[in-house]
Amino acid sequence: MSLAKRFVHLRKASPSFCLRGIYFSGLSYDGYREKLSRNALLHLKLDEAVDLFGEMVKSRPFPSIVEFSKLLSAIAKMKKFDLVISFGEKMEILGVSHNLYTYNIMINCLCRRSQLSFALAILGKMMKLGYGPSIVTLNSLLNGFCHGNRISEAVALVDQMVEMGYQPDTVTFTTLVHGLFQHNKASEAVALVERMVVKGCQPDLVTYGAVINGLCKRGEPDLALNLLNKMEKGKIEADVVIYSTVIDSLCKYRHVDDALNLFTEMDNKGIRPDVFTYSSLISCLCNYGRWSDASRLLSDMLERKINPNVVTFNSLIDAFAKEGKLIEAEKLFDEMIQRSIDPNIVTYNSLINGFCMHDRLDEAQQIFTLMVSKDCLPDVVTYNTLINGFCKAKKVVDGMELFRDMSRRGLVGNTVTYTTLIHGFFQASDCDNAQMVFKQMVSDGVHPNIMTYNTLLDGLCKNGKLEKAMVVFEYLQKSKMEPDIYTYNIMSEGMCKAGKVEDGWDLFCSLSLKGVKPDVIAYNTMISGFCKKGLKEEAYTLFIKMKEDGPLPDSGTYNTLIRAHLRDGDKAASAELIKEMRSCRFAGDASTYGLVTDMLHDGRLDKGFLEVLS
């Protein structure tokens, strides 16, 4: 008979059926008892539990309520709360009286099933029968309030518990704390702890740990640090887990000095840091470029016989590799292996990235070969890093070969993969292959993002394919994807370089209607376009508008206007602009100095002007 059928059969069994069963089964049947031993209950299966309950309700006299509670508790641990509730109801129908323990089990199961009103009804019933709720009862109800989004009632219940003389335990506090954090009530969680202290109901280490952990997860390390200090004033000593949690949070939110101070404080108190503490600090110091401090911490860690793990080494290797300190990164890699710590995909990717960033593609490929030989399979990040390295080195054909190798390994390229290849082909002035990769991307079901479109538009414009760029741009505007300021700047620059300054100006003027604020590049592009067309007045008018309500002019703005006036022989206007530029702490750029030098040679300028510029 299936579990479902046995359950239905059991529900249909009436008291009279059970009484008739006495005649056949005898009054003294107690074979169920051995099945209720602690060891048997640990290995009890659900269908066996259903059968066992059936045996128990057919036995005469009925098993004791203690024996029923053992079975109900075992089923509750299986998380079969509905079955516990049903069996509890069946017991009442048969006249088996519940005790406080079984009422607690029932209330807990009802709360777990979000049937809080029924749980409260049972509470009322048990109190009428003279059973006062225990801390277990109230904790179950508290959990029900929290899961039922009735968090204010949960807080009120704890306050009421204290007033009634109950001593909230660790379960009480941690249940409510987790509920408060789930409902984004971090300040209420802190206030709860402080209120309980005032009422003489001191939360323990576990409760403080739960609040501090919640604050850290929410990105509030300052509040966590403040609570840690209050906790220690209350004579509750924090352990390494709490210190490490706060240190890690301080590190993640860039409070590196506070993290180091807390590390020193825990050390002075004799609380031994663990590998997690060290790894958090080392990673943070590496992110700040403080490699010597990070290395010192690693040395300190080794002196204390605290074994670094792969995370510790990865942080240092990644930092050194990015800064071009590749010898140091390789030494750390060798030390990892000497310590029998297996490098993982993150380790290899960091080294490959470092070598690619510093144009050492041969070594990057060697690391790639090594990781494959060690059965550490490369992922999309590995391939993207190598493809980008080859594309930057103008070796886009090698990048495409890597892309094919990636496919052979069953890896699907992502948006970054295709965008990198598109950019690489455009850099090599290979517009056909760039567009081919874009088409393949779409046919492979990989969705281009705005960066992909910007790369495509920029490549087409810079390679003199403005008409094709316009087709893509018009499609983009009709799609659900919103062009950004970079998109408009690319198109504006493409139009101006193609001599279509009026079209560029129309696009610039449309930005405010599209809700896009022009940036300094947008202004500089149009000012440069006007200057190349000989439209100095329009360029200067835009320059004034820029100073009044746009982004402030930068070095590029001034140098573009200075060169335009110099080419027209307007030395006075150029000198005035140079004076203004220098007051803004900008200097002449290479193009301006090149133009001035040429004009000095052919006599259009005297040496005094060079002094003005310098």
Curated annotation (Swiss-Prot):
Transit peptide extent on chain: 1-7
PPR repeat feature ranges: 64-98, 99-133, 134-168, 169-203, 204-238, 239-273, 274-308, 309-343, 344-378, 379-413, 414-448, 449-483, 484-518, 519-553, 554-588
GO cellular component: mitochondrion
Compartments it resides in: Mitochondrion
Organism domain of life: Eukaryota
SUPFAM superfamilies tied to this protein: TPR-like
Keywords, comma-separated and alphabetical: Mitochondrion, Repeat, Transit peptide
InterPro entries given in the database record: Mito_RNA-Proc/Resp, Pentatricopeptide_rpt, TPR-like_helical_dom_sf
A Pfam family per the record: PPR_2
Family membership: Belongs to the PPR family. P subfamily.
Protein name, as recorded: Pentatricopeptide repeat-containing protein At1g63080, mitochondrial
Organism from which the protein derives: Arabidopsis thaliana (Mouse-ear cress)
